[in-house]
Amino acid sequence: MSQKSYLFNVKGKVQRVGFRFHTAHNALKLGLTGYARNQEDGSVEVLVCGSKDKINQFLEWLQVGPQLARVDSIKQEETQWQELTDFKMY
C-alpha cells in the first residue's frame, strides 16, 4: 500500500471551535499521523500521512469539520512522505 502525505490549509470559522481537537480525533480514528496547527490568518494547517484511501476519507470529514465550525475552502497539496508516529495539535 502506497503511503502519502498531504498538506491542507482550511479556511473559514476553524479556530476557537474545537477544530484541531476533532481533526486529530478523526485522523487517529483512521490511522493517520500528522498535525493540525492554527495559523495567524485564522486558518488551520493540517498535515496528514497515511494511505491514499484513508486520506480521502479524512478529506470528506475535513470538508465539513466539527459541528461548530464552518469550512469555506481547503487548499490541498501532496508533500514529500513524512514518517510520523502520532497526530499532534499546535
UniProtKB/Swiss-Prot annotation:
Enzyme class: hydrolase
Positions annotated as active site in the UniProt record: R20, N38
PROSITE patterns on file: ACYLPHOSPHATASE_2 (PS00151), ACYLPHOSPHATASE_3 (PS51160)
EC number: 3.6.1.7
GO MF term set: acylphosphatase activity
Keyword Iron: no
Pfam families attached to this UniProt entry: Acylphosphatase
Key words of the record: Hydrolase
Catalytic activity field: an acyl phosphate + H2O = a carboxylate + phosphate + H(+)
Record-linked SUPFAM superfamilies: Acylphosphatase/BLUF domain-like (SSF54975)
Sequence ranges assigned to domain Acylphosphatase-like in this UniProt record: 5-90
Family: Belongs to the acylphosphatase family.
PANTHER family: ACYLPHOSPHATASE
Protein name: Acylphosphatase
Source organism per UniProt: Aliivibrio fischeri (strain ATCC 700601 / ES114)
Taxonomic lineage from the root: Bacteria, Pseudomonadati, Pseudomonadota, Gammaproteobacteria, Vibrionales
Gene, per the UniProt record: acyP
